[in-house]
Amino acid sequence: MSATKKYEMMILLTEEFNDSELKTWAFNYAKALRKLSASEISVISRGKRDLSYYINNQKKGNFIQINFSSMPKYVDNFSKNLKFDSNVLRFLILNK
């Protein structure tokens, strides 16, 4: 069994979310992480910002930071879920 590692994930979402929808979206993904045996989950909203260039015809985006601990095999599964979410413009998962 592999040991858990700490991760930091930055997610760029479309600008179409209001504050309550953004919290709901982030809470649902935090629950999904919990189901994949993640621990020490912390969600931080970094706000809506202008983008340097258009991504999928979007000039603004909402940034979400999620810090968590998990086994590497579950992180791969979670990143596959993010790839298929139409609200996600970009995401990056880093080891801490």
Curated annotation (Swiss-Prot):
UniProt main location, coarse: plastid
An example Gene Ontology CC term for this record: ribonucleoprotein complex
Q: Which SUPFAM superfamilies match?
A: Ribosomal protein S6
Keywords associated with the record: Chloroplast, Plastid, Ribonucleoprotein, Ribosomal protein, RNA-binding, rRNA-binding
Q: Which CDD domains match?
A: bS6
Annotated PROSITE patterns: RIBOSOMAL_S6 (PS01048)
Q: Report the subcellular localization.
A: Plastid, Chloroplast
User: RNA-binding: is it a keyword of this entry?
Assistant: yes
What GO molecular-function term can you cite, just one?
small ribosomal subunit rRNA binding
Enumerate the Gene Ontology biological process terms.
translation
User: What is this protein's function?
Assistant: Binds together with bS18 to 16S ribosomal RNA.
Q: Which HAMAP family match?
A: Ribosomal_bS6
Family statement drawn from the similarity comment of this UniProt entry: Belongs to the bacterial ribosomal protein bS6 family.
User: What is this protein's name?
Assistant: Small ribosomal subunit protein bS6c
Q: Which organism is it from?
A: Trieres chinensis (Marine centric diatom)
